[in-house]
Curated annotation (Swiss-Prot):
It catalyses: a 2,3-saturated acyl-[ACP] + NAD(+) = a (2E)-enoyl-[ACP] + NADH + H(+). The gene is fabV. This is Enoyl-[acyl-carrier-protein] reductase [NADH]. HAMAP family: FabV_reductase. Gene3D superfamilies: NAD(P)-binding Rossmann-like Domain.
Length: 397
């Protein structure tokens, strides 16, 4: 079939297999261009491995450090009538490239919140790798089925305490709007912590530890975002921030758990990037369009792969292991430079629908968004007939 982009709300409902492969190949080429990672991991589990920072972590481990990788995700395969999800095609492309390079690659497609999924991964590690020396936790899901009760819990993207009102961009109409978001109640706050907090990360590390599949000196990282005063009302001071604070609690608990094997557990605070997750947060698209323009002008712009490659190569494995007071690895350091943030604050009141594309990198934001789904990649013939059915080495749960 010939596949064109169809955008509804903040998701693109179609995906392009060849474009997704181009995305993965480009990320691999970037990591290879940086040379090998001297003291990198060799057996890596990535939970949430199919898009964004999780995918970038899997690519960096494999192609920077020749690591064997197991990726866990929940994605949809394509059928002859309908394309699959971008994460499915990304993972298929990764698997193909890894095997071409002679690297071990296995994927598990299932609910990463479930005990069954954990058991399957433990079984795979025992059979194929023995142990893992790194566990990356990069899940972004709006819902979680609690393994103990089967109860389905939904998160809420809301402020706490008062209505949040701010200028935002309607990405469908390309115009500025006033966004009003009602504050969360106590139940919504608790639910968001349950879905997006650190409990599941803890459950994973407990299961892996109890099964004896964590190597001496194992490192685990979970990804977070803090942002700045511009986005704090909807993010860090809202329900999402409470969940991310719970990641800090979990990281401390996991650190204690791993101390007997000299393991480490840290939250890595990353910069804002265009992802399916960030597109859903009011104000983020406008803030990202602004910060992208400023960071590109200052020569410090990074996407997912640049961030993760820098973290692996300069913080986690080579270079100095520096953390903040809460033991977090701060990869948002460039974005938080005052030269970027003050310029954003100055720019915010000046932006109108008419000057949106001049004052911000809004067109760059839109292009990046479509690229997530495989559209707009150079060298891909979008008029060609493509097969939406792409199979690879994946364990279906």
């Amino acid at each position: 079939m010939i596949i064109a982009p169809k955008v509804r709300g903040f998701i693109c409902t179609t995906t392009h297999p060849a474009g997704c492969e181009a995305n993965v190949r480009q990320q691999i080429a970037y990591v290879k261009s940086k040379g090998p990672l001297a003291n990198g991991p060799k057996r890596v589990l990535v939970i949430g491995a199919s898009t964004g920072y999780g995918l970038a972590s899997r690519i960096t481990a494999a192609f920077g450090s020749d690591a064997a990788t197991i990726g866990v995700f929940l994605e949809k395969a394509g059928t002859e009538k309908k394309p699959g999800s971008a994460g499915w095609y990304n993972s298929a492309a990764f698997d193909k490239a890894a095997k071409e390079a002679g690297l071990y690659s296995k994927s598990v497609n299932g609910d990463a919140f479930s005990d069954e999924c954990r058991a399957k991964v433990v079984e795979l590690i025992k059979a194929d790798l023995g142990q893992v020396d790194m566990v990356v936790y990069s899940l972004a899901s709006p819902v979680r089925k609690l393994p103990a009760t089967g109860e389905l819990i939904r998160s809420a993207l809301k402020p706490i305490g008062e209505v949040y009102t701010a200028t935002a961009v309607d990405t469908n109409k390309d115009e500025l709007i006033e966004a009003h978001v009602e504050p969360a109640n106590e139940e919504e706050i608790a639910n968001t912590i349950k879905v997006m907090g650190g409990e599941d990360w803890e459950l994973w590390l407990q299961a892996l530890d109890q099964a004896g599949v964590l190597a001496e000196g194992v490192k685990t990282v979970a990804y977070s975002y803090i942002g700045t005063d511009i986005t704090w009302p909807i993010y860090w001071h809202g329900t999402l921030g409470r969940a991310k604070e719970d990641l800090d609690r979990a990281s401390s608990a996991i650190r204690q758990q791993l101390s007997s094997k000299n393991g480490t557990a840290n939250v890595a605070v990353l910069k804002s990037v265009v992802t399916q997750a960030s597109a859903a947060i009011p104000v983020m698209p406008l803030y990202i369009a602004m910060s992208f323009k400023l960071m590109k002008e200052q020569g410090i712009h990074e996407g997912c792969i640049e961030q993760i490659q820098r973290m692996f190569y300069t913080r986690l494995f080579d270079g100095e292991f520096v953390t903040d007071d809460a033991q977090r690895i701060r990869m948002d350091d460039w974005e938080l430079r005052e030269s970027v943030q003050q310029a954003c604050r100055d720019l915010w009141p000046q932006v109108t629908t008419e000057n949106l594309s001049q004052l911000t990198d809004y067109q760059g934001y839109k292009a990046e968004f479509l690229k997530l789904f495989g559209f707009g990649w150079e060298g891909v013939d979008y008029t060609a007939d493509v097969n939406p059915e792409v199979n690879f080495d994946v364990v279906a749960m």
